[in-house]
UniProtKB/Swiss-Prot annotation:
It comes from Photorhabdus laumondii subsp. laumondii (strain DSM 15139 / CIP 105565 / TT01). Residues 7-16 have a biased composition (Polar residues). Its EC number is 3.1.11.6. GO terms for molecular function: exodeoxyribonuclease VII activity. It comes from the Bacteria. Keywords: Cytoplasm, Exonuclease, Hydrolase, Nuclease. Belongs to the XseB family. InterPro entries: Exonuc_VII_S, Exonuc_VII_ssu_sf. SUPFAM superfamilies: XseB-like. Its main location: cytoplasm. It is an enzyme of class 3 (hydrolase). Residues 1-22 are annotated as: Disordered. This is Exodeoxyribonuclease 7 small subunit. It is found in: Cytoplasm.
Amino acid sequence: MPKKNAISESTNSTPETAPAMTFESSLKELEQIVARLESGELALEEALSKFERGIQLARQGQQTLQQAEQRVQILLNDDTQSPLSHFSPDTE
């Protein structure tokens, strides 16, 4: 039986049937999709399909980042011994 390409399998999966992907693998797939879309070489239907998959991946990534941020906040709030201040990327 021929082996299928992992990326083509994941692009045809629905969110309900898709195997759990790491944040990094989702980001890598999203970057590949963006590159293919930017190349302008895809047929309309394939481009639309890739765009839909990209939106799914972007939403999954956003959710993963929000969950990570919540976990960090919980961990920081559990430490009552040290005073904390909000992080600002402009302040170093």
